[in-house]
Regions:
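Short cysteine clusters
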Residues: 62, 86-89
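N-terminal pre-ligand scaffold of iron-sulfur
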Residues: 1-81, 94-95, 107-123
Length: 123
């Protein structure tokens, strides 16, 4: 007898502390655009999918303005590294490291991201 294949759409998960939190279905992420996700502790994450299918997550709060807007920023790449530009003051943040490309003294939190089949719990 064969096991049925998992037909659930893949989910995007963020690592928070020692657990994985399901954020959304991968299909909800439009390449080149971000979405905001409310985290259990009240913070927000900005989640992105690039055109090659890679996913990234950083803190949604723009450290220069204090507004939760990075998920609405424009994405691009600089020297082969993906970034998002704040929609307010246009500072660019590396999506892999969180470092501000325009002011090396400023960073935003990054989150480890994975894509997995749907599950009823975090592990």
């Amino acid at each position: 007898m064969t096991r049925p294949r998992n037909t659930q759409p893949p989910k995007v998960q963020l690592r928070l502390y020692d657990a994985w939190l399901t954020i959304c279905e991968l299909s909800a992420l439009t390449p080149g655009r971000g979405v905001a996700a409310l985290l259990p502790d009240g913070r927000q994450a900005a989640v992105f999918r690039d055109r090659s299918g890679r996913t990234y997550a950083i803190d949604n709060r723009d450290p220069f303005s204090g507004a939760a807007v990075l998920s609405r920023g424009l994405t691009g790449s600089h020297q082969g590294r993906p970034f998002v530009a704040s929609p307010l003051l246009k500072q660019r943040f590396d999506l892999e490291s969180g470092r501000c490309l325009d002011d090396g003294t400023v960073t935003v939190t990054t989150y480890e991201v994975r894509t997995r089949p749907d599950s009823a719990h975090t592990d």
